Amino acid sequence: MALTQRLEFRQSQSLVMTPQLMQAIKLLQLSNLDLTTFVEEELERNPLLERANDEASGGEAPAEAGQFSDSDGGHNDEPGGGPGEAFEPGQEEWMSKDLGTRAEIEQTLDTGLDNVFSEEPAEAAARNAQDAAPTTYTEWGGGASGDEDYNLEAFVAAEVTLGDHLAEQLSVAFTAPAQRMIGQYLIDLVDEAGYLPPDLGQAAERLGASQQEVEDVLAVLQKFDPPGVCARNLSECLAIQLRELDRYDPAMQALVEHLDLLAKRDIAGLRKVCGVDDEDIADMIGEIRRLNPKPGMKFGAARLQTMVPDVYVRPGPDGGWHVELNSDTLPRVLVNQTYYSELSKKIGKDGDKSYFTDALQNATWLVRALDQRARTILKVATEIVRQQDGFFTHGVAHLRPLNLKAVADAIQMHESTVSRVTANKYMATNRGTFELKYFFTASIASADGGEAHSAEAVRHHIKQLIDSEAPAAILSDDTIVERLRASGIDIARRTVAKYREAMRIPSSVQRRRDKQSALGNVLSTAMSDRSRNPEPA
């Protein structure tokens, strides 16, 4: 078989994921807070991007910076002051003869003249005093723009974190560097509730210390303030606090070691393992409840971000619903075409031209991508409102089954696009603020063959049935199934149990025990009050 060389031409098509397309997909699924951060980074990175509300839009700022150019020769009537300012007699000639043009000087010094030649001391002091005086509430509060509210948080002292509080005690408790290192490592592992991981063997291995050395340091850390900190589980946390109160006797130790019985309200089992009577076990349970299961939560932690809705839904004048985007969450950026035009005339190097050409393309793409993102969110939100009109009008019981494909087909988009749009987006309605994904629920068949029911609506129905049950007639899962089927909802018992557990509703046995216990407490309190205040004969 002979080997030959030949040329072949083939035509083929393939999908290419360009960097800009990847960025566009990323923008769709960003939350409004993450989007703001992304746009801020682009504004710092791209010189041709600017905020739409900037005063120097359209290239005014670059034009002002270019007032002192070679063609001007330093003879501009407004060299750096306000309009109408002029040089003192002889000052203009001195500037041109002795120092040359401003542009030449700045190019030589690689910085601006304002950074080199300071003002006269008296003028500088007056200017600083004037600049330092805040003129608006925003300046007092440290706000970034004039339309922001007064920022009282600027005057609030920073909260002390749990790690800082423990580190202060660590420096006093240990003098040996090795123990301090172990202690600091363990403090770094403490979560915001004040707990350490259950297994510290890996910590000893990483530190090159023995398990006993780590345990010795941990024993000291567990005596730090707040009581209960640096525990590895709830039982250990409660035991530390009880030792601090000198209440960790054998009976209390048995109770702490059997918290599972306390969670089940198995009072008889607790009496047996603790070896005490009803009165003592009640007092012991009361002491346990007064302890703090999360001692670290009273210290400062990362500030939670406020949930800001992306879409508002309001009743329309014609009886429908008005859907609009939250304009406050949409970053407004523009491409400074004027600046690019001026730079194009002055740039001589090919590398610089390529840089600014790429910057222009990226800026143009970002503006279009932000606009397309806003339009897509509005389109998806509008379709969700149309599909779930019953929910907005009557409540969660009328929430319809809905999936991503139904919305995607209605607005002629891909299902993956709808999935990205609904991620991390929130809708403010007359019934509260919901994540867009909340409106997508599975369907449960109707018992009479009619319209299917939403899983969220069924969960709501189950919760209503349990909330309205009488203490003497607790509903079992089988009874709930019968009542749901009577309402036209075809559902299995295991589904009811799954929904009930997802809503953290205990079983019928536990609910009966809880309600009987609560009823017994009410009756005993009433009898006690009656014995203290007998009715007059």
Swiss-Prot record:
Record PANTHER family:
RNA POLYMERASE SIGMA-54 FACTOR
Q: What cellular-component terms does GO give this entry? A: DNA-directed RNA polymerase complex; protein-DNA complex
One of its GO biological process terms is:
regulation of DNA-templated transcription
From the UniProt annotation, which stretches of this protein bind DNA?
A: 403-422
NCBIfam families from the entry?
PRK05932.1-3, PRK12469.1, rpoN_sigma
Q: What induces it?
A: Negatively autoregulated.
Which family is this protein grouped under? Belongs to the sigma-54 factor family.
Write out the biased-composition intervals (Low complexity): 55-66
Taxonomic placement: Bacteria, Pseudomonadati, Pseudomonadota, Alphaproteobacteria, Hyphomicrobiales
Q: Which UniProt keywords apply?
A: DNA-binding, DNA-directed RNA polymerase, Nitrogen fixation, Nucleotidyltransferase, Sigma factor, Transcription, Transcription regulation, Transferase
Q: What is this protein called in UniProt?
A: RNA polymerase sigma-54 factor 2
Give me the stretches of Polar residues compositional bias.
518-528
Where can the motif RPON box be found?
492-500
Q: Return the PROSITE patterns for the record.
A: SIGMA54_1 (PS00717), SIGMA54_2 (PS00718), SIGMA54_3 (PS50044)
| Role description | Sigma factors are initiation factors that promote the attachment of RNA polymerase to specific initiation sites and are then released. This sigma factor is responsible for the expression of the nitrogen fixation genes.
